[in-house]
Amino acid sequence: MKRTYQPKKRKHIKVHGFMARMQTKNGRKVLAARRAKGRSKLTVSDEK
């Protein structure tokens, strides 16, 4: 049986990236929470 996680960089960024987070109100809340906590990487887009 095939495993469920088949990683794709493009999909990962499209779903969890900075631009994706900014497009929804809740996504912006996620970024605000991560900024408040002092995360060095806000989204997967920053992992470069």
From Swiss-Prot:
Keywords: Ribonucleoprotein, Ribosomal protein
Ribonucleoprotein among keywords: yes
Biological process (GO), any one: translation
PROSITE patterns, sorted: RIBOSOMAL_L34 (PS00784)
InterPro entries registered for this protein in UniProt: Ribosomal_bL34, Ribosomal_bL34_CS
Source species, domain of life: Bacteria
Family per similarity comment: Belongs to the bacterial ribosomal protein bL34 family.
NCBIfam families: rpmH_bact
HAMAP family referenced in this protein's UniProt entry, alphabetically: Ribosomal_bL34
Name of the protein in its database record: Large ribosomal subunit protein bL34
Organism, as annotated: Metamycoplasma arthritidis (strain 158L3-1) (Mycoplasma arthritidis)
Organism ancestry: Bacteria, Bacillati, Mycoplasmatota, Mycoplasmoidales, Metamycoplasmataceae
